[in-house]
Amino acid sequence: MKTLLLTLVVVTIVCLDLGYTTKCYVTPDVKSETCPAGQDICYTETWCDAWCTSRGKRVNLGCAATCPIVKPGVEIKCCSTDNCNPFPTRKRP
């Protein structure tokens, strides 16, 4: 009886996947990290600075509880699956 109860507890924990958190790419190292509890959104934030024409857009990657507010001149993409915010590739002419 104890074995059956223990088996049910283990199966419940495995099925519920308690404590699961999202993994996102995070700058500056652009490596995959587990997001803090409650931050289940990955985001990619891009914008132009003075070097945009020669170096490309600036990029900020990270985790958030909600999708960040869009500011003028800033593009934000949000997603909610593991590592869904890779560093964007630059389109070459």
Swiss-Prot record:
Q: Which UniProt keywords apply?
A: Acetylcholine receptor inhibiting toxin, Disulfide bond, Ion channel impairing toxin, Neurotoxin, Postsynaptic neurotoxin, Secreted, Signal, Toxin
Tell me the protein's name.
Answer: Alpha-elapitoxin-Oh3a
* SUPFAM superfamilies in the cross-refs: Snake toxin-like
Instruction: Spell out the disulfide connections.
Output: 24-42, 35-63, 48-52, 67-78, 79-84
Signal peptide start-end: 1-21
What InterPro entries does the record tag this protein with? Snake_3FTx (IPR003571), Snake_toxin-like_sf (IPR045860), Snake_toxin_con_site (IPR018354), Toxin_cobra-type (IPR054131)
Q: One biological process GO term for this chain?
A: venom-mediated perturbation of signal transduction in another organism
Say if the entry is tagged with keyword Disulfide bond: yes
| Listed Gene3D superfamilies | CD59
User: Which compartments is it annotated to reside in?
Assistant: Secreted
One Pfam family name from the record? Toxin_cobra-type
Q: Name one GO cellular component term.
A: extracellular space
Q: What does this protein do?
A: Binds to muscular and neuronal nicotinic acetylcholine receptor (nAChR) and inhibits acetylcholine from binding to the receptor, thereby impairing neuromuscular and neuronal transmission. Pseudo-irreversibly inhibits twitches in chick biventer cervicis nerve-muscle preparations in a concentration-dependent manner.
* GO terms assigned for molecular function: acetylcholine receptor inhibitor activity; ion channel inhibitor activity; toxin activity
Family the entry assigns: Belongs to the three-finger toxin family. Long-chain subfamily. Type II alpha-neurotoxin sub-subfamily.
The main location class comes to secreted
Q: What tissue expression does the UniProt record report for this protein?
A: Expressed by the venom gland.
